[in-house]
Amino acid sequence: MKHSKLQTVLALALTFAALWGLLAWDPFRHLRDIFVNPALENAKVSSLLTDPNTQEVSDGQKPLESLRKLESSWCNVSKDRRYILTGNSQTFSVLLAPSEAPQAEADRTYPDLLLDRLNAAGANVHGYRLSAPNISYMEVLWYLNYLLVHPCLIPGEFVIQFNFETFRKTGVREGMLELLEDPDFASIIEQEVRSNAPYANTFQQAIDQYESRIAKEKGNQASSISKTGFAEARGAGNVLETKARTALDHLSLFRSRGEWKAELLDFLYLARVNLLGITPTTKRSLGGGPLTTNLSSLERIGELCRRNGIRVVFFNAPQNPNAPLYRTSADREQYQQIISRLARKFGQGYFDFENSIPGPLWGVWIDGPDPIHFGRAAHRRLADLMFEQGVISGKK
């Protein structure tokens, strides 16, 4: 018996030591450094303005708390003074151009700068950035359905970014599944599934994933309780794990495991770029299931906005002239035809900013010119253009 206990203690000690060693050494940071050019990596700005009153600050990872906070503040704002802008990471990232240097002050992206200009001009509008990296139009539809079951969140204007890459994205990310905690929203999504539209399967998969996660959590809770007939006692393994996690969470090294995961993902991306030659600048075409599903999502977005009195505004996102995303001229023509048709059918406004940012203002990062992200001056330029052209109706 003593020998068995000693083995258990020794196994736990060795496991803890191995975990501690990995966290302390952080092997993926060292592997990542093999591929990184420090001068280029510094171009990615980490100090950005964060304002939960105007931004979904989790960038799609945990939006429920953000939207509940927005709802409480927007209930005192009339619908015609509310607008939401949605898009990919271009809307919340700054990648410095070669001529730009880091600054101590937090940088602002074009949605922030646009809102500042509007209110400085007396527009008296309340804007909100509802964006996520690599967002799909299925996710934009997912968000819109949530907004529509909360009257205080319904915007008077919905500003949607067109981006060539977005038409290639699919699915609803795990972080957005928590919106299904809202029974009214869950009911609406179930109705969308029954529509048999091309995006319906994506929504069904999201529901299945959410229900599987909830069932697993409930199963873990149930399995942690030992029902002996005398009393319900917590299982020893569960108690030990809980106490160990609580103790470890007090250690700064263990709390940094989220950063370690991010470094692992960065390493995998850099390995893909450097070893396989697959980069964001790799030219691609549109087609197949992703295009069909995204188109059907945008059609549904247009229909819902029209039905609910929401003014839809589309804008074609800037592209880097030094790193075009189109594989052929036919790809560009196809894309232009798609967005023009959608804008004519559903848009109360359409603005084309594809060629609005000159090459020298774009970011350069790790593997060369970035096709989507740009620097500080470019964000100011785009915000000025959006203001001057009246993208937000409050400006007019």
Describe the function of each predicted region.
Residues 1-82, 97:
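N-terminal secretory targeting modules
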